Curated annotation (Swiss-Prot):
Mg(2+) binds at D516, D522. Residues 582-642 form the KH domain. GO terms for biological process: mRNA catabolic process; RNA processing. Its cofactor is Mg(2+). It is an enzyme of class 2 (transferase). This is Polyribonucleotide nucleotidyltransferase. The gene is pnp. Gene3D superfamilies: GHMP Kinase, N-terminal domain (3.30.230.70), K Homology domain, type 1 (3.30.1370.10), Nucleic acid-binding proteins (2.40.50.140). NCBIfam families: polynuc_phos, PRK11824.1. SMART domains: KH, S1.
Length: 732
């Protein structure tokens, strides 16, 4: 049945069309907003798979034709998803995954395709809304609508779903997703801004010492206080609830009859459970409290093996795999009971305790800056490299008018050996891109990248037992400091967890892998002394209460300040690798001296570049000469050499008389003539028209580099000497 619904809520006008296209799917919708058109489809396999996780795949695909473009490169088809597409697919996946019923083991694919794009549309908000609508009206047993919401803060005013042009003025980028009952997902980033200050200076330190004023810009992180952030999230939650109520009220008219699916929630053998509880509970609790992750896992396997070999197990015919599942399930029960009833965690910590932290900086002698950050059994080696403007990552958004450039990059790598897996390292996947993006958003507000520079951070996770993305944030901030880069403030991150049973709950600080696996929430918070710069929350319960969210934010703040204190102590001990750092110096000369630095046909500047291994950028109008190189002493030497050149009195040009006959050597050829090296080391131009009495197509048809020729001086103006080929002039 065809249905069309229009909504205008929260600065967003949407039109949903059901039953019009893609009718062979389990559910589909065409969503229109402004000039944006999206197709969302849901397809489910009929046969179940034997997995212990929800077999859900989400794709978000942007078509180039949606913005009137043809894909660049040699292959004129859309290729693998870009970073924005991958991150958007993750957002949709994380918001919708909690809605599926337990025991749902049917492979399901949700696809969102952008068919037309409006430059002012927030494609991530619309993608989630479209996917949720398609799932809601499908015959899959999910009857909850999810709404995405973008929240900005411009000039102190909170805005919901602002146009993208307005979002660029915001100091807050907050993305919320939830149902009419609770929030399911949060992504937040503070957006740094610049303030201007007027400072005293001189007109030109070399040429004009007159006092003047200069306007400078200072980076402000705009970290948000926990109380304000919690308040804005609460406002957003109310907005989402209203939207979801409206969606469900109308979408139900287009919803298909739900399939009666067989669900296979994970069950355990009650007899084995009872036996394990009576005989082996103490052994499992002892294994849970083993300090090392690998030791804990081995002990649990040994217990399962021990049970499988005893007489009762043999009599009952219990298999090892079945026993191990029960042991794992009982382990989860013990972990949660210890936390809720004893306030004690598997590794002996209290609920608010942070694992021991060890920090080493600049351990890589050839790198610009490095930090080995270890927290418990999680270890990140973060390395900073300083590049030039040309090293920036070029990318193009679907609706952008041209290429854009990323001058601050964070790349996160998670090799299998970090968790003891014997697998080869492969290309980064969605998880790596997501963690790198979170770390970048956490650090970006405090990093001020000069216009002519590019900073790249690479995080190599060497050990992982929870919170590796937050270790990347901590290590990244110190790696930047180790590369002698000024930060507006240090940034630290911590992962929070949640255990909920009936009316009891406990919030955990700095969760390890066990608590992430057996807990109900993964809540990552990063920030400075002043507030939060980035946050990411995923909930497994189907929602989180506002009270718990506020408490988790405050508890995260306490942990962050503790970590920042340790990081500050480490930062004070950093020994900068001065000899490794690229150096850049700008000197000011009189604009008339620029020609001396360049030299005839670029001879002098080329010699400087080759001799000192530097690059040189010149602003002719202002007389600014910027010298950049990988070796600081060579950069300084090049600057000294340039100043020597510009301070030397300009030599008088070698003077020739019109009609002088000279012998010279062809030094260089161009399409308009040849340059001849004359006595005294000066060059003269032998124009192509003077090479023959007739027409010459190519200079090389008459003379080549290295040829000795006899020429006649036709004219001289200063250093510019015009020559004629003697043998041609004699014939004339």
């Amino acid at each position: 049945m065809k249905c069309r619904f229009e909504f205008e809520m929260n600065n967003l006008k949407e039109i949903y069309e059901f039953g019009e296209v893609a009718k062979q799917t389990n559910g589909s919708v065409l969503l229109k907003s402004g000039k944006t058109v999206m197709l969302a489809t849901v397809v489910m396999e009929k046969e179940m798979v034997d997995e212990d996780f929800l077999p859900l795949t989400v794709q978000y695909i942007e078509k180039s034709y949606a913005a009137g473009k043809i894909p660049g490169g040699f292959v004129k088809r859309e290729q693998k998803p870009g970073d924005f597409e991958t991150l958007t697919a993750r957002i949709v996946d994380r918001a919708l995954r909690p809605l599926f019923p337990k025991g749902y083991l049917y492979p399901t694919v949700i696809t969102v395709m952008v068919l037309s794009a409006d430059p002012e549309s927030d494609l991530q908000v619309l993608a989630l809304n479209a996917a949720s609508a398609a799932l809601f009206v499908s015959d899959i047993p999910v009857r909850k609508a999810v709404s995405g919401l973008r929240v900005a803060k411009v000039d102190g005013e909170v805005l919901f779903n602002p146009p993208l042009s307005k979002l660029k003025e915001s100091t807050l980028d907050l993305y919320l997703a939830g149902t009419k009952e609770e929030l399911l997902m949060i992504e937040m980033a503070a957006i740094g801004s610049y303030k201007t200050e007027v400072v005293p200076t001189t007109v030109d330190p070399l040429m004009d010492p007159t006092l003047a004023e200069e306007v400078i810009t200072i980076k402000e992180p705009n970290a948000m206080k926990e109380e304000e952030l919690a308040s804005i999230i609460a406002q957003g939650k109310d907005v989402i609830q209203i939207a979801c109520n409206e969606y469900e009220k109308y979408f139900i008219e287009s919803a298909k009859e739900q399939l009666e699916l067989e669900l296979l929630p994970q069950t355990i053998d009650e007899d084995i459970w009872t036996y394990v509880e009576e005989i082996y509970a103490a052994d499992i609790k002892e294994a849970v409290q083993a300090m090392a992750k690998s030791e804990r896992n081995e002990l649990l396997k040994e217990i399962a093996k021990k049970i499988s070999e005893d007489d009762v197990a043999k009599e009952q015919g219990w298999e090892y795999e079945t026993i191990y599942k029960v042991v794992e399930k009982y382990k989860r029960k013990i972990v949660r009971e210890m936390i809720l009833n004893e306030g004690k965690r598997a590794d002996g910590r209290g609920l608010k305790d942070v694992r021991p932290i060890d920090i080493k900086t600049n351990i890589l002698p050839s790198a610009h800056g490095s930090c080995l950050f270890t927290r418990g059994e999680t270890q990140a080696l973060v390395v900073c490299t300083i590049g030039e403007k040309t090293d920036a990552q070029m990318y193009e958004m679907l609706t952008s008018k041209g290429p854009e450039y990323e001058h601050f990059m964070v790349h996160y790598n998670f090799p299998p050996f970090s968790v003891g897996e014997a697998k080869p390292i492969s290309a980064p996947g969605r998880r790596e891109l997501g963690h790198g993006n979170l770390a970048r958003r956490a650090l970006e507000p405090v990093v001020d990248v000069p216009e002519d520079k590019t900073y790249r951070l690479v995080s190599e996770i060497l050990e992982s037992n929870g919170s590796s993305s937050m270790a990347t944030v901590c290590g990244g901030a110190l790696a930047l400091k180790a590369a002698n880069i000024d930060l507006a403030d240090l940034v630290a991150g911590v992962a929070m967890g949640l255990i909920v049973e009936d009316d009891k709950y406990a919030i955990l600080t700095d969760i390890m892998g066990l608590e992430d696996h057996d807990g109900d929430m993964d809540f990552k918070v990063a920030g400075t002394h002043d507030g939060v710069t980035a946050m990411q929350m995923d909930i497994k319960l189907g929602g989180v209460q506002q009270e718990i969210l506020e408490q988790a934010l405050q508890q995260a703040r306490e942990a962050r300040l503790h970590i920042l204190k340790i990081m500050e102590e480490a930062a004070e001990k950093i020994e900068i690798n001065e000899e490794n750092l690229p150096s850049s110096h700008t000197i000011t000369v009189h604009p008339s001296k620029i020609v001396d630095i360049i030299g005839q046909a670029g001879k002098t500047i080329k010699e400087i570049i080759e001799k000192f291994e530097v690059s040189i950028d010149i602003d002719r109008d202002k007389g600014k000469v910027k010298v950049t190189g990988k070796n600081r002493p060579k950069v300084i030497a090049a600057c000294d050499y340039i100043q020597e050149i510009t301070n030397k009195p300009k030599p008088e040009p070698v003077k020739f008389q019109e009609g002088d006959i000279l012998k010279g050597k062809i030094k260089r050829t161009t399409n308009f003539g040849a340059f001849v090296e004359l006595p005294g080391g000066v060059d003269g131009l032998l124009h192509i028209s003077k090479l023959s009495s007739g027409r010459v197509e190519r200079v090389e048809d008459v003379v080549n580099i290295g040829d000795e020729v006899e020429v006649e001086v036709l004219s001289q103006k200063g250093h510019k000497i015009e020559l004629g080929l003697r043998q041609v002039l004699k014939k004339a």
